[in-house]
A protein has these predicted regions:
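Conserved small/polar residues in nucleotide/adenosyl-binding loops
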Residues: 1-7, 255-259
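A glycine-/small-polar-enriched, mobile loop at the entrance of the PLP active site in fold-type I
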Residues: 11-31
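Active-site region of PLP-dependent enzymes
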Residues: 17, 150-156, 163-257
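Phosphate-binding glycine-rich loop
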Residues: 25-67, 81-83, 91, 158
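Short amphipathic alpha-helical/adjacent loop interface patches that line ligand
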Residues: 29, 33, 52, 72, ...
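Conserved SAM-binding loop
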Residues: 47, 70, 185
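PLP-dependent aminotransferase-like
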Residues: 60-147, 154
Length: 259
């Protein structure tokens, strides 16, 4: 399997040498965005160099202010992205069943400074997206999901990337789908030009050849990362099946263990 994938990747990157276009939203980058939109059943995918920058620049693009309710049970990046935007994280405890945010405790944490909720899907378990949506609508809050653990998951026929105002994915090499390093922001609808704003923010805030209208960063996914993503996406269903078999084996052995 590994030898086959290596040869497939070599074939994929030959186009990069032929085009002499190594980065800056080239053909592989654009192709991967389109393929992921189809796979995730979402209107828009914006690729980034890594998941952290995807989340940090998404928060910036949505102009959040004040306080953001999030979970302490997550990788450090989630909180760092909030703090690096000058916002205050307010931690909501998790429930003991699946370690996602305890929705019964969210409203008590909302103040007049709260602008958003950033829940985290954990170990493939989705948050209570319906309850969170109801709370957010009631209090006029944005919802951004850290979906790094749930690539490809569906709920009631909807892809995980379609919930909330937007979702962030990590495509780090440890994930079931990866681009070596990488990440993405996914969302439905136009949302006041969010795709264009994200495009600018990950490219130094450059809007066009003469206009720089935001303080941005260099967070573009390069062509070699995108090529790896295109290769891995073709085999993703098989990789998910492999992991499912491993989970089933662990569950069986632990369930029958005397320890």
């Amino acid at each position: 399997g590994d030898v086959y994938k290596r040869q497939e990747y070599i074939e994929e990157i030959k186009d990069i040498w032929d085009s002499h276009w190594l980065t800056n939203m080239g053909a592989k980058h654009n192709e991967l965005e389109k393929e992921l939109e189809k796979y995730l059943k979402v209107d828009h995918v914006s690729l980034f160099s890594n998941g952290h920058m995807a989340l940090e620049l998404l928060i910036q693009a949505l102009h959040l202010t004040g306080e953001v309710i999030t979970t302490p049970f997550t990788f450090a990046s989630t909180t760092h992205a909030i703090v690096r935007n000058g916002l205050t994280p307010v931690f909501c405890d998790v429930n003991p069943e699946d370690y996602t945010m305890d929705v019964s405790k969210i409203e008590a944490l909302i103040t007049d400074k709260t602008s958003a909720i950033i829940p985290v899907h954990v170990y493939g378990n989705l948050c209570d997206v319906e309850a969170i949506e109801a709370i957010a609508k009631k209090h006029h809050l944005k919802v951004i999901y850290d979906a790094a653990h749930t690539f490809g998951v569906t709920y009631k026929g909807r892809g995980v990337a379609t919930f909330g105002d937007a979702s962030m994915f990590s495509f780090h090499a440890t994930k079931v789908f990866h681009t070596i390093e990488g990440g993405a922001v996914c969302f439905n609808g136009e949302q006041n030009g969010l795709k264009e704003d994200l495009y600018g923010l990950k490219n130094f805030g450059i809007r066009n050849e003469v206009v720089v209208d935001a303080v941005g960063a260099n967070s573009k996914m390069n062509e070699f990362q995108a090529a790896m993503g295109l290769c891995n996406l073709r085999h993703l269903d098989g990789e998910i099946e492999k992991r499912s078999r491993v989970v089933a084996r662990y569950s069986c052995l632990l369930y029958t263990s005397d320890a």
